[in-house]
């Protein structure tokens, strides 16, 4: 942070302390020369950095510009307390999670250990049937007859061991497959294995004419983590030696997985096979051997920290609209990326290291000077060690020479700058904008941080909110008890939110040094009249207060609301800033903000049908989903901020008309990392940055509301100058996918901004214009966007709300692609 910014921040924090002192009572007697770190006061006040109403009533400690609850007497050890021989805490902690909206909540089992269902894990017995029995128990959503369900969540846990399987493991909808994080178990494919993949997330129905268990674009809420998958017993020439069939959509993750495959010359093995979908995030993956590390086709995906060793082809891209790869290591592969062009529309690769690989990137077609012929490609900070060709065509033509060197910034596609509506096709070096040092690790790469799993901690380092009195039954008001638990145990214990639906009717404050862990996406939801007034919005979950610093880690949680009218709900206000010495120290992983469309929200098809007959008042889902405030930092990985467009429960298909005002608003001075995030269907905007600085965003994905422009944005919300950009002048405005105002140091590396409907009709797709404009950057901002894909937006980028770049100049299959745009 520049000195001027830092001084301003400290002054404003000091002013805040003055406000607190004037609003409350300073009960201590303090000498004028007393160090600030030693001042303690009791304060009652109503203060929020957003201006929204937030009740603060707690004893606080003022410590080096921090306002925080009194520290616990026994802080959580920084490096954990578990001995190497201790079991992974998840295996032995008390499991009392529930699914309160299940027809039989008292008997439904959320957590299930595969060994309780007969799995042996000795590498000899066939455990496939036992594992699938553990997955299926409880009348869960699978088999092809259930399009989706949130009322049968499950964690299927694998203790350490080797699990031999002769048939596929099929994770049903809303399933987390979790292995022992201390000693990841091995899933070993039998020599006779002949199914599609060892783990199949969307099976084809036998004799079903190509039908599958779930619609791929709606195959939400899945996670697989902590496994070694070994297919080397399967004959090398059999493609059934595939680790994971991963045809999925948003709110899905793969993490901490190693796949071992044959390295024979005739190998047909694959690490991941993915033919369709709309993802998604995956990270911390290693693929050894095989014909393909990843064989992939999907609208969009974010991949972080991927290593592929000794594969014939590291990544085979059969089609996409836009993928972002961050932190890629390719070693001893014949081809790093094999892109089937032009149907692979856009590939963006940052912080890659490629070693002893003849071809880093190969396109199947030559560009011949046009985007449409070979798609868009962006490389940023790619280090080559003994690489024959950096970019080549399948016919042998070398586009960019290899060697041992670093490619700072290079691209293939249409490049634009500022307000100039005329782009140029480039196949060469691109301007390489500087990135804020706060966004980078010690080696100059964008920071990436693995999903915390606390494998070095014992079960006794955790407390259960249900043990401490919270109900999570979807009915009881848990506001008071959750505030008490968080106040008491932040920094002392890891707080385990047993599976359930926790209702709060007032602000819940999440203090610095809170580590909170959900179970199969525990739901925390705001409800009631305090969140009903959009003229006076109120925070539901407040993560830190303005000027507070500290560790915050939130994993496997869903923040939500309960209708009928929560038009004033700011669902999450993020004020916390990471400690200076801990990059990405304040973040969320595999946690989402989801409103409407599921059991328990009162915002389903029965309440808010697509035709709008229920009216606005009954169908407000929130005012603003996520507000990252000025003094905050944030690391968000795999976070989906989704206003439901259809029911996930009920028939799983019916479209609904529910209304959320705004998606993600950031005013942060940084650092902020938005890695593999999405924001969809909010009335005014999906992403907005205002007076912000030092953001890395890649990949971001949006969809505009299906009902717009009937009514047009911002209806049914009133224009609010404190939270909203000025509406653009159009006869029927729709929501901004992205709006950036008075911001600097904004680095967007992969964006998919989509508009699929116009007043619930898709006829506009044919004309490629379901809305007039979709991304706006003002002239006061410094922004660089790489690999922007849009769907059916007339103007892809606007400057000061005036459309500049017409999509027709950048048609790239179904999408239109801008390879690079810089504001200056």
Identify the function of each model-found stretch.
Residues 160-162, 174, 499-500, 507, ...:
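Tight coil/turn sites that cap or link beta-strands
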Residues 484, 488-489, 494-507, 660-689, ...:
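C-terminal, well-structured subdomains that either form a transmembrane helix-short loop-helix hairpin
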Residues 167, 175, 289-291, 299-315, ...:
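Internal alpha-helical scaffold/solenoid segments in large eukaryotic proteins
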Residues 113, 157-159, 176-178, 496-498, ...:
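Beta-strand cores of modular interaction/reader domains in eukaryotic scaffold and signaling proteins
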Residues 319, 341, 365, 499, ...:
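Active-site proximal loops enriched in glycine and acidic residues that flank catalytic Cys/His/Asp
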Residues 2-155, 168-170, 182-243, 247-255, ...:
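Extracellular "leader-to-stem" segments immediately downstream of a signal peptide or signal-anchor
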Residues 167-168, 172-180, 504-522, 685-686, ...:
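Classical protein tyrosine phosphatase
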């Amino acid at each position: 942070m520049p000195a001027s910014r830092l001084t301003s921040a400290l002054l404003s924090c000091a002013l805040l302390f003055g406000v607190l002192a004037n609003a409350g009572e300073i009960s201590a007697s303090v000498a004028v020369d007393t160090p600030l770190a030693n001042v303690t006061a009791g304060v009652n006040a109503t203060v929020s950095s957003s201006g929204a109403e937030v009740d603060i009533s707690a004893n606080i400690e003022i410590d080096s510009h921090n306002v925080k609850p009194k520290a616990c007497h026994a802080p959580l050890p920084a490096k954990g307390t578990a001995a190497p021989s201790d079991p992974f805490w998840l295996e032995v902690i008390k499991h009392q999670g529930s699914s309160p909206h299940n027809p039989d909540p008292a008997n439904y089992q959320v957590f299930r250990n595969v060994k309780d269902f007969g799995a042996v894990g000795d590498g000899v017995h066939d455990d496939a049937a036992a594992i699938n029995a553990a997955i299926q128990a409880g009348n869960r959503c699978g088999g092809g007859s259930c399009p989706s369900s949130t009322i049968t969540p499950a964690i299927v846990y694998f203790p350490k061991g080797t699990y031999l399987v002769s048939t596929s493991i099929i994770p049903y909808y809303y399933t987390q497959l979790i292995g022992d994080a201390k000693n990841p178990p091995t899933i070993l494919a039998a020599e006779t294995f002949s199914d599609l993949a060892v783990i199949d997330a969307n099976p084809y129905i036998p004799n079903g004419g190509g039908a599958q268990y779930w619609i791929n674009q709606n195959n939400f809420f899945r996670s697989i983590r902590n496994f070694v998958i070994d297919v080397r017993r399967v004959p090398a020439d059999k493609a059934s030696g595939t680790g994971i069939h991963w045809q999925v959509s948003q709110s899905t993750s793969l993490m901490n997985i190693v796949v071992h495959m044959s390295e024979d010359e005739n190998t047909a093995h694959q690490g991941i096979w993915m033919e369709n979908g709309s993802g998604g995030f995956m990270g911390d993956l290693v693929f050894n051997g095989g014909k393909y590390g990843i064989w992939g086709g999907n609208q969009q995906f974010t991949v972080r920290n991927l290593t592929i060793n000794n594969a014939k082809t590291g990544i085979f891209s059969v089609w996409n609209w836009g993928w972002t790869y961050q932190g890629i290591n390719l070693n001893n592969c014949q081809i790093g990326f094999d892109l089937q062009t032009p149907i692979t529309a856009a590939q963006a690769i940052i912080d890659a290291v490629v070693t002893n690989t003849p071809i880093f990137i190969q396109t199947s077609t030559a560009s011949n000077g046009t985007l449409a012929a070979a798609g868009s490609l962006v490389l940023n900070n790619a280090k080559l060690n003994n690489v024959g060709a950096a970019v080549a065509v399948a016919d042998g033509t070398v586009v960019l020479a290899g060697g041992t060197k670093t490619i700072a910034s290079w691209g293939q596609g249409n490049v634009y700058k500022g307000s100039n509506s005329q782009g140029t096709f480039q196949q060469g070096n691109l301007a390489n904008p500087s990135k804020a040092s706060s966004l980078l690790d010690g080696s100059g790469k964008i920071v990436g941080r693995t999903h915390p799993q606390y494998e070095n901690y014992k079960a006794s380092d955790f407390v259960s909110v249900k043990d401490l009195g919270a109900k999570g039954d979807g009915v009881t008001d848990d506001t008071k008890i959750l505030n008490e638990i968080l106040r008491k145990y932040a920094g002392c214990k890891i707080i385990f939110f047993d599976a359930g639906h926790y209702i709060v009717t007032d602000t819940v404050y999440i203090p610095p040094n809170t580590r909170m862990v959900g179970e199969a996406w525990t739901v925390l939801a705001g409800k009631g009249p305090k969140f009903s007034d959009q003229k006076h919005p109120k925070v539901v979950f407040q993560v830190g207060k303005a000027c507070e610093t500290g560790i915050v880690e939130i994993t496997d949680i869903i923040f939500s609301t309960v209708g009928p009218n929560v038009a004033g709900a700011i669902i999450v206000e993020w004020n916390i800033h990471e400690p200076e010495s801990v990059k990405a120290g304040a973040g969320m992983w595999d946690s989402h903000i989801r409103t409407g469309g599921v059991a328990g929200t009162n915002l389903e098809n029965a309440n808010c049908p697509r035709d709008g007959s229920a009216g606005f008042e009954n169908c407000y889902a929130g005012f603003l989903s996520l507000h990252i405030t000025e003094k905050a930092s944030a690391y968000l990985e795999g976070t989906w901020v989704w206003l439901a467009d259809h029911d996930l429960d009920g028939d799983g298909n019916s479209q609904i008309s529910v209304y959320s005002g705004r998606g993600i608003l950031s005013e942060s001075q940084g650092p902020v990392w938005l890695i593999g995030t999405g924001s969809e269907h909010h009335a005014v905007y999906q992403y907005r940055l205002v007076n912000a600085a030092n953001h890395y965003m890649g990949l971001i994905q949006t969809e505009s509301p299906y009902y717009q422009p009937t009514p047009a944005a911002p209806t049914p919300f009133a224009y609010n100058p404190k939270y909203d950009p000025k509406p653009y002048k159009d006869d029927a405005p729709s929501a901004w996918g992205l709006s950036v105002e008075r911001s600097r140091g904004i680095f967007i590396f992969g964006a998919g901004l989509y508009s699929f409907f116009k007043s619930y009709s898709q006829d506009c797709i044919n004309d490629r214009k379901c809305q007039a404009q979709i991304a706006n950057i003002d002239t006061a901002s410094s922004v660089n966007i790489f690999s922007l894909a849009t769907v059916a937006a007339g103007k892809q980028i606007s400057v000061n709300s005036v459309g500049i770049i017409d999509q027709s100049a950048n048609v790239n299959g179904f999408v239109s692609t801008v390879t690079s745009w810089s504001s200056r």
